[in-house]
Regions:
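Residue-level marker of intrinsically disordered, low-complexity segments enriched
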Residues: 2-3, 38, 53, 65
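C-terminal low-complexity, charged extensions that often adopt amphipathic alpha-helices
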Residues: 2-4, 9, 75-78
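Noncatalytic linker/hinge segments flanking ATPase motor cores
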Residues: 7, 55-60
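Short acidic amphipathic segments
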Residues: 12-15, 22, 30-51, 55-57, ...
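Solvent-exposed, non-transmembrane alpha-helical starts
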Residues: 24-26, 64
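Charge-rich, low-aromatic oligomerization/scaffolding segments with amphipathic character
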Residues: 58-77
């Protein structure tokens, strides 16, 4: 999924997703997916702005690659 980094400090990144609007269901799917990434400690998804804040420990690169791999089509909530 395409995104841009809005703000970043060590161990925390806030990203904005390129989409017109985000439904609550999409926000829930994104939150669920981000929480499953290794090294993620906390996730906050803002559906009104299509942003997500991720607190993590470990590799920044792994987190950003994980975010990039996300797709609403491939994720399902059970």
């Amino acid at each position: 999924m395409k995104f841009v980094i809005r703000h970043e400090i060590r161990g925390r990144v806030r990203v904005h997703f390129y989409q017109k609007d985000m439904s609550i269901r999409q926000a829930d799917l994104l939150h669920y997916y981000l929480c499953t990434l290794p090294g993620v400690k906390n996730v906050r998804v803002y559906e009104r702005t299509a942003d997500a804040a991720v607190v993590y420990e470990g590799s920044r690169r792994c987190i950003l690659e994980g975010i990039q791999r996300f797709s609403y089509d491939s994720e399902r909530m059970e």
